[in-house]
């Protein structure tokens, strides 16, 4: 079916969904698709859809519209693929949510803390989606769960290369996701935990400490618990990092997606009181290529500076070399024989190494630390925000930055990331 839209006719398709089925679609490159719920009730990753409201999805978006009771959905625009599936694990995901809600009710009755859930699995099994679903279902029942993001490759609480936590007070927006007001964010500096596993585990512990402090003073946060998203690196040091996170957050439930081996290893290595559940991944989960991941990371950073669909105007200004101190967390590895007596390579991983401003800083992201002095344990201090270096003038001893806020910078300790952002779009 199509309606008249000038020269290029806009493709319009209607889908009748039976109960407990989902419409899956992907938006074609450089296209947008509008979706509208015409009749019935439906949800996208746990967020209810408003009837007769048009939702817009940009190129590359992968969306699943699920209905418990049946509905009619209309899509306008070019999709790479669009089909209705009866084969969905949503009932299992709902059962998981129901079990967590029972734990919250018990916590309320017995004046204890609510469930802390960690979602694990290899890459491309839908971990972030399951987290979003569990958080949305909880908040729709009046809970206030905390979302903890340990996946530095995607950084959905802030930008890639960071770890953080977000107090969820309303369901995720269908188009934009969760409202990112006032997240707690820590600088990691790279998109893979393996570049500095000691720092990664240290920040995990720090996030757990801060979450515990919040639970002590906020009963609602304590009863609601948390949902922890993790990296898809599940072998070797990556596996050890999962075990470390489970212990740091004292998790009660581990949801393993699509990997029996990981499920059995965690069952063996985690304390017996931790409930470990194996759930299937959704058939709608798509494998993402390296290029697609890189594009997603760039989009995430672009959105940080320019807002969702370019609704912000970032500021550009010069910063004097003498006004700031730039550091990198972690010194390069050197042979053990060259290390001072009694020092190990691991100590090196948390070391703050001063960075001399130079042209090689161009396009690199810098985290603005909340620390007031170098003695503040900068690597474990949260960050105020991020800037990207767009130019360096050695003669004038200044570098130009793109910043979401106007000058001056709120603090003068900066941490450099391995991540670069070319502002080309």
Curated annotation (Swiss-Prot):
It is found in: Nucleus. It comes from Gallus gallus (Chicken). It comes from the Eukaryota. Pfam families: Clp1, CLP1_N, CLP1_P. The keyword ATP-binding applies. Polynucleotide kinase that can phosphorylate the 5'-hydroxyl groups of double-stranded RNA (dsRNA), single-stranded RNA (ssRNA), double stranded DNA (dsDNA) and double-stranded DNA:RNA hybrids. dsRNA is phosphorylated more efficiently than dsDNA, and the RNA component of a DNA:RNA hybrid is phosphorylated more efficiently than the DNA component. Plays a role in both tRNA splicing and mRNA 3'-end formation. Component of the tRNA splicing endonuclease complex. Component of pre-mRNA cleavage complex II (CF-II). The gene is CLP1. Keywords: ATP-binding, Kinase, mRNA processing, Nucleotide-binding, Nucleus, Transferase, tRNA processing. Its EC number is 2.7.1.78. GO terms for biological process: cerebellar cortex development; global gene silencing by mRNA cleavage; mRNA 3'-end processing; RISC complex assembly; tRNA splicing, via endonucleolytic cleavage and ligation. ATP binds at residues 22, 62, 124-129. This is Polyribonucleotide 5'-hydroxyl-kinase Clp1. It catalyses: a 5'-end dephospho-2'-deoxyribonucleoside-DNA + ATP = a 5'-end 5'-phospho-2'-deoxyribonucleoside-DNA + ADP + H(+); a 5'-end dephospho-ribonucleoside-RNA + ATP = a 5'-end 5'-phospho-ribonucleoside-RNA + ADP + H(+). It is an enzyme of class 2 (transferase). Belongs to the Clp1 family. Clp1 subfamily. GO terms for cellular component: cytosol; mRNA cleavage factor complex; nucleoplasm; nucleus; tRNA-intron endonuclease complex. One of its GO terms (molecular function) is ATP-dependent polydeoxyribonucleotide 5'-hydroxyl-kinase activity.
